[in-house]
Amino acid sequence: MAKKKKSAHYSGIGGQAVLEGVMMKNKDDYAVAIRKADGEIDVEVDVFRGLFPGSRITKIPFLRGIFNFIDSLRLGMKCINHSAQFYEDGEAEETKLDKALDKISGGRGEKILMGFTTVLSIVLAVAVFILLPYYLSTLLNGFIRNDSLLAIIEGVIRIAIFLLYIVAISLMKDIHRLYQYHGAEHKCINCIEKGRPLTVYNAMKSSRIHKRCGTSFLFFVVFVSIILFFFIRVSNPVYRVLLRIALIPVIAGISYEIIRLAGRSDNILIRIISAPGMWLQKLTTKEPDEEMLEVAIKSVEAVFDWKNYLYEEFGYEVDESWMKDGALSDDSEEGTGEE
């Protein structure tokens, strides 16, 4: 069958980098591929059920973003813990806390710890990125009386903390490799969404930047929070803090709808609002090596039939001759791809 003109087609898959590996998710199925210390690739496939599987409330615009955000944190934490097990020094001994939790919860101690870790992560993120900028801006109350200017300063501080955090952790060796796997994840998705057979060569030529990336989502969270906090104000300092906490679900819901729209559209407005988040991905993704791409490809193939996808979306069947290096590959489009 004749091949259709190539353009980006939404695939529905997404994922994240984990320690020495990549997690890919397609609908309820997800796979975690890990490069073990001996060089072999371990692939685990499972089904993830959200907080309210099948419930209509998780489909309602703006509300769905809240549930999606929580589910992403839960799954992400689970996959990172799974990948960490491959690089622990020997078998980790079960602690007294583990035994006590298992006894009390009927063997659900690991899930309880995972839930606690997720909640703690959210609390720390709120403290650092929401409450700290507000507190620092209040230190200027004696010098600046204009509430609008203080709101702008709070937003600038929030952006500065966000950028400093990204830059600081990128200097860590392990995080640098995590960012390389992050780039591998993006390259694989961009490769198939551009209509190319998923090979190491084709993936390497694809962009490591993607519009549906979590980095872009976090940028929208910061941006939306600045706008909401600027226009929605109260005079009481305690109420100001409570208001910022109460608006977090609203911020997450709005940000999710923006990035969801960005992943399905490509008009000039979408490109403009997506640009800052995609620029930030220059910091949170790095160029992967071929072995990292092999891991990412294994993860994709465990949950997604990319050959059937190419046939349905681009109108051609993949044969073995196309799987050779350079087959159906365009020039590198670094910085222009979408996740």
Which stretches of residues belong to each language-model region?
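Cytosolic juxtamembrane amphipathic/interface segments immediately preceding
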Residues: 4-18, 53-59, 98-114, 200-206
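Divalent-cation
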Residues: 1-88, 92
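Multi-pass alpha-helical transmembrane bundle typical of ion/small-solute transporters
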Residues: 48-49, 53-56, 65-69, 76-94, ...
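Juxtamembrane "helix exit" motif at the C-terminal ends of alpha-helical transmembrane segments
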Residues: 82, 121-146, 221-245, 252, ...
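Polar-ligand-bearing catalytic/cofactor-coordination segments
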Residues: 2-14, 18, 22-24, 144, ...
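Residue-level signature of transmembrane alpha-helical entry/exit and packing/kink sites
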Residues: 110, 114, 118, 150-158, ...
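Select subsegments of transmembrane alpha-helices in polytopic membrane proteins
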Residues: 113-129, 210-221
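Membrane interface segments of multi-pass transport proteins and intramembrane proteases
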Residues: 98-108, 135-153, 232-242, 261-271, ...
